[in-house]
Amino acid sequence: MLNKVKTFIDTHKLLPLDGRYIVGLSGGADSVALLLILKELGYYVEAAHCNFLLRGEESQRDEDFCIKLCKENNIELHLIHFDTAEYAELHKVSIEMAARTLRYNYFEALRHDIDADAICIAHHRDDSVVGNANGVGICI
């Protein structure tokens, strides 16, 4: 698996090894795998976890898992809590659109604040990924 990912990154010239990268960490299998694989390949990664406060105890369990995972793997973790329902109501958008907007705005602000080279997001084939052309790198 590591060799396959490394070959893909190299073939598509996605990530210089000397960069600083933010990995969006939901706590799900895809984002955990991306984070740990990039770290294992020697990339400097920091994780960013958004708690949208939408699923009660389950949201807190995801956050706790991300904290534990990053601590055990010596990875810096950036955490933020959003009142997603309030944002959705205020901006008259769906919960899904509110969460997406909050997440990507946060990732971009964090990228700027810590001078990261790219934001890496794990998606699978059924996900839709929209790239941002203003210098934000999204790795898939």
Show the residue positions of the predicted features.
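Core alpha/beta nucleotide-donor-binding catalytic domains of modification enzymes
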Residues: 1-140
